[in-house]
Amino acid sequence: MSDQLTLTAETRERGGKGASRELRRNGRVPAVVYGGKEEPLMIHVEEKLLMKQLMTGHFMNSVVMIEVGGKQIRTLPKDVAFHPVKDRPIHADFLRIAKDATVQVAVPVVFQNEEKSPGLKRGGVLNIVRHELELVCDADNIPDEIAIDVTGFDIGDSIHISNVTLPKGVESAITDRDFTIATIVAPSALKSSDGDTTKDEGEDAAEGGDEA
């Protein structure tokens, strides 16, 4: 389960591009807290602290307690916008959540036991279709990552959501199909060799036809 994080914030009186630019010049990131049947709350947070939490790797699927005005607001990060050139955060959105809330989050996947995959041992390539899974779970039970065991998978095999064992209390947000997460594909050298073989066989057949 992801650790709970804390962000100290201050309220901001003005919105708009001019006010936001001024905040960024002072090392602050404008943000908004919304949801929970309450009015949106405009805040700003320290850029360095936000960057530090983003670098944990699980910020977007962690409960973040925002401390502002002497109280704490329980939230889930929903979006962080970055400057297209400087790669610095320029805005953040947070969703208010109740303590017993059920949330939908994107959780990264990791692949295990690659040395036990016949396809990968033969030089196959793990083609990842989904780097994250959309999951539904309690806010206090968000996984850091989902481990996927590739033991026994061969070249040409696909790994579907039905092949994945999710933690207790965690479900896939997509329930209408058995979607693909990854496939094991043949290496380029093997594909090329197969193609040459097919080509040779075709030429042989054509020559045989001429002789007839």
UniProtKB/Swiss-Prot annotation:
**Acidic residues biased stretches:** 201-212
Which GO MF term does the entry hold, naming one?
5S rRNA binding
Please give the Pfam families that the UniProt record associates with this protein: Ribosomal_L25p, Ribosomal_TL5_C
Q: Which Gene3D superfamilies match?
A: Ribosomal protein L25, beta domain (2.170.120.20), Ribosomal Protein L25, Chain P (2.40.240.10)
Any one GO BP annotation for this protein: translation
Q: Where is the composition biased (Basic and acidic residues)?
A: 10-23
Keyword entries, A-Z: Ribonucleoprotein, Ribosomal protein, RNA-binding, rRNA-binding
Q: Where is this region: Disordered?
A: 1-23, 190-212
Q: Which GO terms describe its cellular component?
A: cytosolic large ribosomal subunit
Q: Does the keyword RNA-binding apply?
A: yes
Q: Carries keyword rRNA-binding?
A: yes
Superkingdom of source: Bacteria
* PANTHER family linked: RIBOSOMAL PROTEIN L25/GLN-TRNA SYNTHETASE, ANTI-CODON-BINDING DOMAIN-CONTAINING PROTEIN (PTHR33284), RIBOSOMAL PROTEIN L25_GLN-TRNA SYNTHETASE, ANTI-CODON-BINDING DOMAIN-CONTAINING PROTEIN (PTHR33284:SF1)
Purpose of the protein: This is one of the proteins that binds to the 5S RNA in the ribosome where it forms part of the central protuberance.
Family recorded in the similarity comment: Belongs to the bacterial ribosomal protein bL25 family. CTC subfamily.
Assembly behavior: Part of the 50S ribosomal subunit; part of the 5S rRNA/L5/L18/L25 subcomplex. Contacts the 5S rRNA. Binds to the 5S rRNA independently of L5 and L18.
Q: Would you tell me the protein name for this molecule? A: Large ribosomal subunit protein bL25
Q: Which organism is it from?
A: Sphingopyxis alaskensis (strain DSM 13593 / LMG 18877 / RB2256) (Sphingomonas alaskensis)
Q: Gene name on record?
A: rplY
